[in-house]
Amino acid sequence: MSSIKLIVGLANPGAEYAATRHNAGAWFVDRLADAYRQPLKEESKFFGYTSRLNLAGQDVRLLVPTTFMNLSGKAVAAMATFYRIQPDEILVAHDELDLLPGIAKLKLGGGHGGHNGLKDIISKLGNNPNFHRLRIGIGHPGDKSKVTGFVLGKPPTSEQTLIDDAIDEAVRCTEILMKEDMIKAMNRLHAFKPA
């Protein structure tokens, strides 16, 4: 059984960003909330939208920060402190440039890879990077100078379908993660091939 108590989906707030690649983490948390019929509600003390799920008999909180991406740690730290959740009990879902659309991978710890949301969370958790990550592939524009425009752009329909398929599989694997363990969830998710 997993000890995950908080699942966070990273995003920028506002309608203009809702469909951009940088919000892939929030798409995952939204899909998870829908799958368990527990809609997210805004909770200002946690600087985000929150919900509470019973996942495989365990109490799990969901959070989509309403801060901008580079301030995500404020929301994560507020919720973690309030509910006494340790970094290794947190799963952060985020967009990943180094994976292609249609691929999602789980990992524990590591650096921020230039991702401003992860950077701020690590900082606000007392420079502790040892939380779980769900990396949702969005692909790379091929040139470092194009990254900002790329992550703040909307994927074409063909890529969106691949990203959605990977997110749906990640939702299914979250149940495996909670019921069994990280290794089983990783094995299934990492073997996934989009149609």
From Swiss-Prot:
Subcellular location: Cytoplasm
Coarse class of the protein's main subcellular location: cytoplasm
Record-linked Pfam families: Pept_tRNA_hydro (PF01195)
Site annotation Discriminates between blocked and unblocked aminoacyl-tRNA: residues: 12
Keywords: Cytoplasm, Hydrolase, RNA-binding, tRNA-binding
Active site, UniProt feature: 22 (proton acceptor)
SUPFAM superfamilies: Peptidyl-tRNA hydrolase-like (SSF53178)
InterPro entries: Pept_tRNA_hydro, Pept_tRNA_hydro_CS, Pept_tRNA_hydro_sf
Class in the EC hierarchy, top level: hydrolase
GO MF: peptidyl-tRNA hydrolase activity; tRNA binding
Binding site for tRNA: 17, 68, 70, 116
Known catalytic reactions: an N-acyl-L-alpha-aminoacyl-tRNA + H2O = an N-acyl-L-amino acid + a tRNA + H(+)
Annotated CDD domains: PTH
Assigned EC number: 3.1.1.29
Annotated site location: Stabilizes the basic form of H active site to accept a proton: 95
Gene Ontology annotations for the cellular component aspect, listed alphabetically: cytoplasm
Source organism superkingdom: Bacteria
GO terms of biological process kind: protein quality control for misfolded or incompletely synthesized proteins; rescue of stalled ribosome
PANTHER family: PEPTIDYL-TRNA HYDROLASE
Subunit details: Monomer.
Recorded family membership: Belongs to the PTH family.
Protein role: Hydrolyzes ribosome-free peptidyl-tRNAs (with 1 or more amino acids incorporated), which drop off the ribosome during protein synthesis, or as a result of ribosome stalling. Catalyzes the release of premature peptidyl moieties from peptidyl-tRNA molecules trapped in stalled 50S ribosomal subunits, and thus maintains levels of free tRNAs and 50S ribosomes.
Name of the protein described by the UniProt record: Peptidyl-tRNA hydrolase
Organism: Pectobacterium carotovorum subsp. carotovorum (strain PC1)
